[in-house]
Amino acid sequence: MSPTELIREIEKRRTFAIISHPDAGKTTLTEKLLLFGGAIQLAGTVKSRKASRHATSDWMELEKQRGISVTSSVMQFPYKDRIINLLDTPGHADFSEDTYRTLTAVDSALMVIDSAKGVEERTIKLMEVCRLRNTPILTFINKLDREGQEPIELLDEIERVLGIRCAPLTWPIGMGKRFKGIFHLSHNRIHLFSPTHGGKIKTGEQIQGLDNPRLSELLGNQVEELQEEIALVQGASHPFDKEAFLAGEQTPVFFGSAMNNFGVEELLDAYVEYAPSPRARETATRRVAPKELKFSGFVFKIQANMDPQHRDRIAFLRVCSGSYQKGMKLRHTRLGREVQIANVLTFMAGEREQAETAWPGDIIGFHNHGTIQIGDTFTQGEELQFTGIPHFAPELFRRVRLKDPLRTKALLKGLQQLSEEGATQLFRPLLGNDLILGAVGVLQFDVVAHRLKHEYSVDCGYDSVQVVTARWVSCNDSRRLEEFRTKAAAHLALDGAGNLTYLAPTRVNLDLTMERWPEVAFHAIREHALGVEDGNPLVASL
């Protein structure tokens, strides 16, 4: 691999995720991007779910049943001399942690907004995450073929609620029953709306210029209204500023109808033109540039049983620098171990292929036999640890109840493997034999029970447990920590990675315990793999 070849491959890559509130049309837009990219021939539209076609990115059985995305899928496809890596994030609020980690693996994000509902709660939370990292954001305002809010009101709401300047690059001509198409402001071109569903790509007539006589023929009285509106928009809105976009301060805005394949091509064309290629990444010791010749990357997700026939676990790794070549040896820095990585996968939703090479920005999958954790770094020898991949304290807890005591071993294996994915956390109290599951949303418990039954043949239920929150515990004084461990044993547990955790029965109890033990640190967040928060090492099982 020459430096020139590496730079050429880096410049080709665009890695992004789609963020939205549930039902804004994220999964449909994902399908249509794949359709325009030539990655699929038939879009599994939402309406056709009952006819046994499901969205390509919703590959897990439970997702197909419920019609929601609960895991992050990875899809790669070529488009206009670029390689697009699209990470589909969970649409359900209960899976925010998985989405948060996915957003650490991308270089930009596409925000989808329902034109009728405007900025919704989940979008606000996801944008906060993007703002922390100054992630460049493109915006697609969807469902223009239905009645919705006025476009100017939507832009105002985005600016006011999300705190990001809007630069419209396309503008709708009417909406709902009066929706006639979009005007491309920078190209001075009208693209007329022609509704198409599923796998058909119909371009619709394109007309150059607002004063074109053909426009009057087609739109009649709507032309003057459109001319006035466009003049107002051009005078009042922010012009597109690429530097402000790359700094996460301004978002280019596009309008369309994903269900009808309309406005998607303009969005995709602008995305490959404006979105950044892979960017430098922070580690605990230094910044790693993608053009460095030596390979490095980090694991942001683990998925169990992507292939139910093989009971496998796949670790998803974002390549940060250099290139992966089949069969190369890599250093697993957390374990200080050299490993030969022979069978690496690339993804198209549930479909997988063997990867011969991979470049910065690409997402590849390693087979994980229980040694890889979320946040782990792999390099060609250097002791690096990529940072910024958090683990949050869960907010809901349940005691796991096994219906068949003979399946105890299978239950433990299933819970350990599923908790490695990071959507739920398993806690084993120091006293007794309970297994306590922690999550940030109720749906996660349903998902675990469903997957235990279908993937591990384990039937389980849940009991309530007197735990309101968890805190990871650390202390620089090992003698004092051992004393705390003895005296607070009734409320202590080990998490899936062996870290000591305080399971607080009430908020008052937590406050009193923290007052009573000032030398002990209680952490609501810990970094994956590092086991460090605010400079304090989190203690593994002692």
Curated annotation (Swiss-Prot):
Pfam families: EF-G_D2, GTP_EFTU, RF3_C
InterPro entries membership: EF-G-like_DII (IPR053905), EFG_III/V (IPR035647), G_TR_CS (IPR031157), P-loop_NTPase (IPR027417), PrfC (IPR004548), RF3_C (IPR032090), RF3_dom_3_sf (IPR038467), RF3_GTP-bd (IPR041732)
Family that this chain belongs to: Belongs to the TRAFAC class translation factor GTPase superfamily. Classic translation factor GTPase family. PrfC subfamily.
GO biological process, one term: regulation of translational termination
Alphabetical UniProt keywords: Cytoplasm, GTP-binding, Nucleotide-binding, Protein biosynthesis
Species the sequence originates in: Nitrosococcus oceani (strain ATCC 19707 / BCRC 17464 / JCM 30415 / NCIMB 11848 / C-107)
Binding residues for GTP: 20-27, 88-92, 142-145
Cited function: Increases the formation of ribosomal termination complexes and stimulates activities of RF-1 and RF-2. It binds guanine nucleotides and has strong preference for UGA stop codons. It may interact directly with the ribosome. The stimulation of RF-1 and RF-2 is significantly reduced by GTP and GDP, but not by GMP.
Subcellular location field: Cytoplasm
Record's protein name: Peptide chain release factor 3
Any Gene Ontology CC annotation: cytosol
Annotated tr-type G domain residues: 11-279
